[in-house]
């Protein structure tokens, strides 16, 4: 069966509901980390992926292997893996990992921000950008910085699923698209 983000969200909501019902929602980060370890292992190991997704291997063996890989021996987690394996829904794990991670950020009122700069800058400047975003959003910021020399100057921000381009490269591309020849082609051809 093909993996579906919609179906994965239903399973993730069921897990969240169970955690809330059992009073274990405060341990959500542990579950997120376990799913992320499992996802990473499935992406990096073809033999593990073949074994976990195989319809021929008994679900109990699949659950045992997933539990070992996730390094998380929790009753609710193992029971949830058993449900996934019994229904042959192991292929939803990568989507569920992402959904649970986003839910964890939302519950902690944290926004994940990726800051792309043309070159290295001081921590003071990075902290100023972080503080400005935190003031605008009213949330804690989980900031990751990257460097891309192609930007020439300025910066690019990825805040959640939104993209803000304040780079020289982006400005030049805007100019080019605004003044591009009607027949297409590059305005700055050599």
Curated annotation (Swiss-Prot):
Pfam families: OSCP. It is found in: Cell inner membrane. Its main location: membrane. Keywords: ATP synthesis, Cell inner membrane, Cell membrane, CF(1), Hydrogen ion transport, Ion transport, Membrane, Transport. It comes from the Bacteria. The keyword Transcription does not apply. The keyword Chloroplast does not apply. GO terms for molecular function: proton-transporting ATP synthase activity, rotational mechanism. This is ATP synthase subunit delta. It comes from Petrotoga mobilis (strain DSM 10674 / SJ95).
């Amino acid at each position: 069966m093909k993996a579906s983000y919609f179906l994965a969200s239903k399973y993730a909501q069921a897990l969240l509901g169970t955690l809330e019902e059992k009073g274990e929602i405060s341990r959500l980060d542990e579950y997120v980390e376990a799913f992320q370890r499992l996802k990473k292992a499935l992406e990096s190991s073809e033999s593990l992926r073949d074994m976990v997704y195989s319809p021929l291997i008994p679900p109990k063996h699949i659950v045992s292997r997933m539990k070992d890989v996730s390094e998380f021996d929790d009753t609710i987690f193992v029971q949830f893996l058993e449900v996934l394996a019994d229904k042959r829904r192991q292929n939803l794990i990568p989507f569920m990992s992402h959904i649970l991670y986003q839910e964890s950020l939302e519950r902690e009122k944290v926004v994940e921000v990726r800051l792309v700069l043309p070159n290295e800058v001081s921590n003071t400047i990075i902290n100023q950008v972080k503080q400005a975003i935190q003031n605008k959003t009213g949330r804690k910021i989980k900031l990751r910085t990257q460097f891309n020399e192609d930007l020439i100057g300025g910066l690019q921000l990825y805040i959640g699923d939104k993209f803000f381009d304040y780079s020289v490269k982006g400005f030049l591309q805007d100019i080019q698209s605004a003044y591009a020849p009607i027949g297409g082609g590059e305005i700055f051809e050599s």
